[in-house]
Amino acid sequence: METKEKQKDTKFGYYKKEIDKIITGYIKKKEPVLLYGPSRFALESGGKRIRGILAILGYKIVSNKGINRKIFFASSALEILHLFTLVHDDIMDNADSRRGRPTIRKKWDSNTALLSGDLLVGLAYESLMKADLPQIKNALIEFNKALIEVCEGQAYDKEFEEKDTVSIKEYEMMIQKKTGRLIESSLLIGAILGNAKPKELKALSRYGKMIGRAF
């Protein structure tokens, strides 16, 4: 008999496999080569899929109807959006490697990486819209809010590099937007699509912020 821990690992492994399947098979087009080649390279970069799995868990926490297959498209959308942030972050940091592979800006160039990141945003929205459950509009609103705040966080990060001192409060605000917000949003979007009540969303938001801060 499997232990509870083993069952949990197997379940999370299944979620990751399903998310991977959607993400790695997302781009069918081959031309323009300079757009789809690097973008496919990003989508095939792997990862733990933490944000995608959190969306599924957020859905499961509030829904008593089991897993709706459409939630995997929302999970994939969050992972693709996360990839966008990494691609653009690598441009801003002049990074040469990520996840044991060259970054797009290193393998190609910064302009190509910029364009690939832009495409990933579009693909993320496209994937989320495939999760056309009754609360999809509210999920899209939350998704967009998270994207804006992630960009704000990245901007604060660059601004703080030019400051002599940064307060703890300022730093915590920056990391909440840059890193924590998408973690929080992953739980919220899953829960929203599962028809969460306001008090459930409030609790998950608080929990998501704590996870995000830990990152």
Task: Specify the residue positions occupied by each region the protein language model found.
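Mg2+-dependent prenyl diphosphate-binding active-site environment of isoprenoid biosynthetic enzymes
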Residues: 14, 18, 24, 28-215
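Long, acidic, intrinsically disordered low-complexity segments
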Residues: 1-21
